[in-house]
């Protein structure tokens, strides 16, 4: 920290999460506090909630601001969908719920698997993220086998065609324990699909008033939400339309403009 504090180049740090393990360790928290105060000219949070939680943990850090993460919304809005038979080997009448995320405990993909076990056989879950031998993925796969829904759970691993996969899906969702500002939620909404997410920090702020929120780990509530989206076409369209409008607020150009304006304040012309 001492060496970095003498660096003549202004340093800017971006905080991407509302929670991390270092904050729970008093030694690491104090070290981080020194670094934030001594080394950085500005600390940028990727969302308002990330700014709020950062300020609660490091109240002495005053050089803060928030610049929302953003995505190329047009890329997702204009993507060409696959046929479900082509992508997953299932009928076009099947109702597909997709989550794009690494397989980590905090992502809680198991909640979606549990919800599938409480829904008709026409409901399928599609997971994008992580390698085939990933430990977290294997645990979720085992859960699907235990609940006898493995034929309705599709693991697509790492993909470069996520926009097309989202366009093929009926609902996009995120079942995380917490997020910073979830890009997956914005991408899902930009695809023009209803977005369903846990009512937690980092998701609530983006989804509330547009998509649908459910209680963390509550697979019963999730199953009811998915059933309603499947059976009520007017409700489905209303949520889809609201999500498209919400996604437009997080277009990547807005993020670029925010960072450019910030950097220009520290550039000596």
Task: Place the predicted regions along the sequence by residue.
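Nucleotide-sugar donor phosphate/pyrophosphate-binding loop at the beta->alpha transition
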Residues: 9-10, 19-40, 52, 58
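Aromatic "clamp/platform" in nucleotide-sugar-dependent glycosyltransferases that forms part
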Residues: 158, 177
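A short helix/loop element that forms part of the nucleotide-sugar donor recognition site in Leloir-type
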Residues: 76-90, 142, 235
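Short, structured helix-loop element that forms part of the nucleotide-activated donor/catalytic region
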Residues: 126-150, 235
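A conserved mid-protein helix/loop that constitutes part of the nucleotide-sugar donor-binding site
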Residues: 95, 99-118, 135-139, 220-221, ...
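A short, active-site helix/loop in glycosyltransferases that binds the activated sugar's phosphate group
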Residues: 40-65, 71-75
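Short hydrophobic beta-strand element within catalytic cores of glycosyltransferases
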Residues: 194-197
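Conserved acidic donor-binding segment of nucleotide-sugar-dependent glycosyltransferases
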Residues: 212-219, 228-233, 248
């Amino acid at each position: 920290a001492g060496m970095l504090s003498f660096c003549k180049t202004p340093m800017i740090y971006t905080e991407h999460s509302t929670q991390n393990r270092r904050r729970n360790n008093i030694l690491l928290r104090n070290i981080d506090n020194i670094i934030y105060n001594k080394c950085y000219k500005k600390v940028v949070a990727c969302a308002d909630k990330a700014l709020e939680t950062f300020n609660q943990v490091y109240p002495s850090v005053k050089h803060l601001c928030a610049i929302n993460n953003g995505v190329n919304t047009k890329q997702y809005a204009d993507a060409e969908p696959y046929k479900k038979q082509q992508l997953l080997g299932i009928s076009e009448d099947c109702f597909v719920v997709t989550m794009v995320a690494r397989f980590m405990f905090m992502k809680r993909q198991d909640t979606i698997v549990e919800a599938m076990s409480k829904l008709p056989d026409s409901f399928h879950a599609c997971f994008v993220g992580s390698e085939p031998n990933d430990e977290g993925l294997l645990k979720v796969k085992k859960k699907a086998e235990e609940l006898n829904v493995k034929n309705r759970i599709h693991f697509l691993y790492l993909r470069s065609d996520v926009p097309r996969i989202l366009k093929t899906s009926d609902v996009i969702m995120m079942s995380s324990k917490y997020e910073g500002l979830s890009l997956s939620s914005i991408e899902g909404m930009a695809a023009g699909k209803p977005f369903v997410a846990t009512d937690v920090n980092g998701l609530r702020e983006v989804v509330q008033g547009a998509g649908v929120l459910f209680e963390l780990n509550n697979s019963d509530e999730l199953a009811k939400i998915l059933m309603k989206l499947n059976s009520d076409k007017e409700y489905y369209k209303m949520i889809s339309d609201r999500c498209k409008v919400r996604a437009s607020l997080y277009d990547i150009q807005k993020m670029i403009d925010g960072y450019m304006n910030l950097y220009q304040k520290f550039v000596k012309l």
